[in-house]
């Protein structure tokens, strides 16, 4: 496990990994930054059953998701799931990563800006995914103030969040308090309600215009997704392993559900 020292190293490692495996690397110039948003697309090597996107590095002080996606690319971890196509976004906030801050270099929290195109990094990502049709996505984050994992997980199969948390628990601790980031949480899962209630709640939250990335993707029609929150108060290697475990369990559940449908 090796944490990238800066965004330039992330770019170099992503470029090298993509070239070594013949993956499709797309660069999206970010206005005013002289930097590119990176996207790596990995086609399914067998008959495709699903498309999964993974987003990391929205906040520059949350390194485990970035390490996770770099390992995913460098270690060719997608090969364990040959029927799934992946779209990987290694770091959404280049200047925040270099500064080690939640916000970008202008002090803006990108994860409150996805309702509009005002912030260059957000505008670039919105355009990059506007025409995609992911079956599900992982918005990988960390909670720097926690000692246990939790997730905001929204799936048509209500058993999936619990199963994902169980897989993560094999790698590290799960949150034990009744609240996470001022939201009720039970067994590592932030309360979500049934599908009708969830949609109503989402629309209420979205009314204030301070959208995190999942709200934008929800508005595009993607209904199955999770935000992972690894605990920033424990060692990095464990947090990275927990991120891998959450992603892998989701992929396995997705494949199994598609196989059952055929």
Across the structure, where does each feature detected by a protein language model lie?
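Structured catalytic-domain cores with a bias toward divalent-metal coordination
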Residues: 1-262
């Amino acid at each position: 496990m090796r944490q990238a020292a800066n965004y330039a190293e992330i770019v170099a490692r992503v470029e090298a990994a993509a070239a070594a495996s013949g993956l499709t690397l797309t660069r999206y110039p970010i206005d005013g930054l002289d930097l590119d948003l990176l996207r790596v697309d990995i086609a399914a090597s067998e008959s495709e059953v699903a498309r999964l996107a993974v987003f990391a590095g929205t906040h520059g002080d949350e390194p485990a998701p970035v390490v996770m996606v770099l390992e995913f690319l460098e270690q060719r971890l997608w090969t364990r799931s040959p029927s799934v196509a992946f779209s990987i976004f290694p770091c959404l906030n280049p200047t925040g990563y270099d500064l080690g801050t939640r916000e970008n270099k202008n002090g803006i929290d990108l994860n409150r800006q996805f309702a509009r195109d005002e912030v260059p990094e957000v505008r670039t990502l919105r355009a990059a995914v506007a025409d995609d049709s992911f079956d599900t996505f992982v918005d990988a984050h960390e909670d720097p103030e926690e000692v246990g994992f939790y997730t905001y997980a929204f799936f048509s199969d209500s058993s999936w969040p619990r199963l994902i948390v169980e897989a993560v628990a094999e790698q590290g601790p799960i949150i034990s308090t009744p609240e996470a980031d001022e939201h009720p949480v039970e067994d590592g899962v932030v309360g979500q309600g049934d599908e009708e209630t969830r949609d109503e709640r989402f629309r209420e939250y979205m009314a204030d215009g301070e959208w995190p990335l999942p709200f934008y993707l929800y508005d595009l029609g993607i209904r199955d997704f999770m935000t992972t929150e690894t605990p920033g108060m424990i060692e990095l290697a464990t947090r990275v392993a927990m991120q891998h475990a959450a992603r892998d369990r989701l992929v396995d559940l997705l494949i199994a559900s598609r196989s059952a449908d055929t």
